[in-house]
Amino acid sequence: MTIYEIKSYLSRPYAEAAFKFANENNIVDDWIYMIEEICKILKNIKIYSLSSFILKKNKNFLFESIKNNFDVYFNNFVKIIIENNRLIIFPEILNQFINLKNDQNNIENITIISKYKLDKKILNKIEKKIKSLIFKEIKINIKIDKSIIGGYIIKSKNFLIDNSIKNKLYRFSEYL
């Protein structure tokens, strides 16, 4: 199991519980904002990377320093995560929470990776094709990666289309 898979596995129950509560109370966007704020705080202090080794008094200090910024329900959520030594997975909780919201709203996040910035016409063609295949609204995130040599990679949580030259060379080398 990769680190990403472990974080994903550990964060899923927290994200699902948080989303269920936020959804039932019509405060999903508020919770996204609060989780984003916690992620920013943790990124700035970088202490969470050793979350299981942080002394209890430091965890309490961290919680006391942030609790006035959030409502009581979110504070309870944060407290549970701190007590279970899971601060390190907060960014993944955010990702999964957003994915749950998008699933509910029938939206698919798509990442398109290419060596160069893609032309608008090409992006529109890709968007139309994907929409016709998955019957969902899509949000496109574009990343530039010079290592793919050429072509593009289209991925979401449900599929991967690797049309990169790097992948084609790799597959060709397997035949040799």
UniProtKB/Swiss-Prot annotation:
It is a peripheral membrane protein. The keyword Transport applies. This is ATP synthase subunit delta. HAMAP family: ATP_synth_delta_bact (MF_01416). Belongs to the ATPase delta chain family. GO terms for cellular component: plasma membrane; proton-transporting ATP synthase complex. F(1)F(0) ATP synthase produces ATP from ADP in the presence of a proton or sodium gradient. F-type ATPases consist of two structural domains, F(1) containing the extramembraneous catalytic core and F(0) containing the membrane proton channel, linked together by a central stalk and a peripheral stalk. During catalysis, ATP synthesis in the catalytic domain of F(1) is coupled via a rotary mechanism of the central stalk subunits to proton translocation. This protein is part of the stalk that links CF(0) to CF(1). It either transmits conformational changes from CF(0) to CF(1) or is implicated in proton conduction. Keywords: ATP synthesis, Cell membrane, CF(1), Hydrogen ion transport, Ion transport, Membrane, Transport. It comes from the Bacteria.
